[in-house]
UniProtKB/Swiss-Prot annotation:
This is 5-oxoprolinase subunit A. Coiled coil: none annotated. It comes from Clostridium beijerinckii (strain ATCC 51743 / NCIMB 8052) (Clostridium acetobutylicum). SUPFAM superfamilies: Glycoside hydrolase/deacetylase (SSF88713). PANTHER family: 5-OXOPROLINASE SUBUNIT A, UNCHARACTERIZED PROTEIN YBGL-RELATED. Belongs to the LamB/PxpA family. It comes from the Bacteria. InterPro entries: Glyco_hydro/deAcase_b/a-brl (IPR011330), LamB/YcsF/PxpA-like (IPR005501). One of its GO terms (molecular function) is ATP binding.
C-alpha cells in the first residue's frame, strides 16, 4: 500500500488579521507547519494552533521564515548562512516551547517561502539550515522540496528528511517550483491537481510546465489552507487518495 503525508501551513494569522481556514482544514491533514512569528503569527496564534493540532491528533512542525511580515516571507533576503541558521533555531525554539507546554513533541521543520526556495538551490544556505535543525534536535525531520539542495544537505549530515511535492504548483524541468509571478505557476483545476498528485505518488513522475515528464519522489504532499476553494480541495484530495488505496499518515510514521 502506498503511504503519504498530507501537510498544510497553519497559524498564519496575526493580531486581529485572520488568515486561512485552520479550524476546518485541520481535520483532513496529517501534519501541520506552524508559523513561528517571523513571516506570520504571534505568540497567541502559535499557542492556539499547537492546541488545535493536538486536539485533532495532527503532528506539529515549525515553519520558520524570513523576518518579513509585510512580504509574508515571500521576498528574498540577502542573509549569510550564519544568520539563516540562527533564524531557524530561534523560531524552532519559540514553537517548541508551546509544544512542550502541551506535552507534545515537535515532528518536523519546513522552511517557509523565500527561505525554502533559496535554500532549495543554494547548498551553503541549505547546509546552514540543516545544521541548525540537527543541533537543536537530531530527531527532527526536515520537510523539503523533492530533488532540492536541502535534501542533499540533510542527507550529508544524517538529518532525517522528507521529500515534499505540491498539489497546486507547477514545476520547471529542473524540478524547482515555477515562480508565482509566472503564468501557469498555480494549478487551479482541482481534477488536474489531484491526478498529478496520484501520478507523483504511484509513478514517481510529474509533468513539468513545458509538458515533459520529470522524475520525482514524494513523502509528503502540501495543500494550502487559504483561498476560496481551499477547504473543498483538501477534502477532495484526501478522499481521492484514499480511493486510490493511498494511506495518509504523519511523517514520523514514514520514518
Amino acid at each position: 500500500m502506498y503511504k503519504v503525508d498530507l501537510n498544510c501551513d497553519l497559524g498564519e494569522s496575526f493580531g486581529s488579521y485572520k488568515l486561512g481556514l485552520d479550524e476546518e482544514v485541520i481535520s483532513y491533514i496529517s501534519s501541520a507547519n506552524i508559523a513561528c512569528g517571523f513571516h506570520a503569527a504571534d505568540p497567541l496564534v502559535m499557542d492556539y494552533t499547537v492546541k488545535l493540532a493536538k486536539a485533532a491528533g495532527v503532528s506539529v512542525g515549525a515553519h520558520p521564515g524570513f523576518p518579513d511580515l509585510v512580504g509574508f516571507g515571500r521576498r528574498n533576503m540577502n542573509v549569510s548562512p550564519k544568520e539563516a541558521k540562527a533564524m531557524v533555531q530561534y523560531q524552532i525554539g519559540a514553537l517548541d516551547s508551546f509544544c512542550r507546554a502541551q506535552g507534545i513533541k515537535m515532528q518536523h521543520v519546513k522552511p517557509h517561502g523565500a527561505l525554502y526556495n533559496m535554500a532549495g538551490k543554494d547548498l551553503k544556505l541549505a547546509e546552514a539550515i540543516c545544521e541548525g535543525i540537527y543541533e537543536v534536535n537530531p530527531e527532527l525531520i526536515l520537510l523539503a522540496l523533492s530533488g532540492s539542495e536541502m535534501i542533499n544537505a540533510a542527507q550529508n549530515i544524517g538529518l532525517k528528511v522528507a521529500r515534499e511535492a505540491f498539489a497546486d504548483r507547477a514545476y520547471e524541468e529542473d524540478g524547482s517550483l515555477v515562480a508565482r509571478t509566472k503564468e501557469g505557476a498555480m494549478i487551479t483545476d482541482e481534477e488536474v491537481a489531484i491526478k498529478r498528485v496520484i501520478k507523483m505518488i504511484k509513478e514517481n513522475k510529474v509533468t513539468s510546465i513545458t509538458g515533459k515528464d520529470i522524475p520525482i519522489k514524494v513523502d509528503s504532499i502540501c495543500v494550502h489552507g487559504d483561498g476560496a476553494k481551499a477547504l473543498e480541495f483538501v477534502k477532495k484530495i484526501k478522499l481521492s487518495l484514499e480511493e486510490e488505496n493511498i494511506e495518509i499518515i504523519p511523517l514520523h510514521k514514514i520514518y
